[in-house]
Amino acid sequence: MDGTYKPQSVRRVGIPKPDGSERELGIPTVTDRLIQQALLQVLQPLIDPTFSEHSYGFRPGRRARDAVLAAQQYVREGRLIVVDVDLSRFFDRVNHDILIDRLRKRVNDVGVIRLVRAYLNAGIMDGGVVAERMEGTPQGGPLSPLLANVLLDEVDRELERRGHRFARYADDCNVYVRSQKAGERVMALLRRRYDKLRLKINESKSAVTSAFGRKFLGFELYKTGKDEVKRAVARKAQEAFKQKIRQLTRRSGGRSIEQVIEDLRPYVLGWKGYFGLAQTPKVWLRLDEWMRHRMRAIQLKHWRCGTTIYRELLALGAPAAVARQVAANSRRWQRNSRYLLNSILTIAYFDRLGMPRLS
């Protein structure tokens, strides 16, 4: 590995974000991805053990849930103010010279350093045109997360040196303190430290505020009537979930109810796997009922006319009077016969169809 290899340009791909902006990914070629992965397998065991224990993102044996649990513990200890820092376009603004300088302090192989530099300098292709890249380490390549941790670790160490309690996941960092005044001091410190790295804080998304109700990795903390600190799915994450379900259960396309459920299943189970850490059983029940409500509407549309609805409901064991009333009100079932339909198309009915549940 003498560092003479020249990587190909990465392909730009824009991923829409909930706020309407785009997250820019740089997708490397198959060959470059393999080389980056091999490089990662060599570097990660050497570098990862040097990182702060408060860093959780893209590290072996660490997950987002660990960062959320750490945040919960800090708040339980009485650190009720959070310094929530959002870095503006972090991966796009990484300074190459500063990053390479920090990497040299951990890796003394000249060939490796040259190869990493070559990947940083590789152009980015957009619409068939290759543009030179002077800064940034685009998301999409295997090396980018490790390099991000290399750059940000010195900020972690400064916070540790001052005795702060914090959790960082990639460029998302929350510091927990006991007072607003202490939080303002920490924010000023972080501005100085990030400025030295030529990184910018997104002031509109950063704040010194109450730790309760502040979104962190899709979760937020809340206090019960017994003063217990618990975890919940953030409101924005719930709304994003519902929006995705709306897309997956759109009533057009001619799909059977079984096909709709099959399309729904991977997303719901994946979402449940991530947010299963939340301590909000009532939210799960509410979202489950909301999903079943949409599925009932789809089922009625598939049955189309009143006679088919009547026949299908009878086949499911509904009393004739109930089936007749639902069929007669099929266009206004939500207002006139919602509870009757719920008594037929029950939770057990959707369980038999394989519909996943959150609760």
Predicted regions and their residues:
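Conserved polymerase palm-domain catalytic core
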Residues: 3-14, 18, 50-62, 66-213
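A conserved non-catalytic segment of reverse transcriptases
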Residues: 121, 191-192, 196-263, 267-269
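Extended C-terminal regions of large enzymes
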Residues: 294, 303-359
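Duplex nucleic acid-engaging cores and interfaces of nucleic-acid transaction enzymes
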Residues: 30-31, 35-38, 72
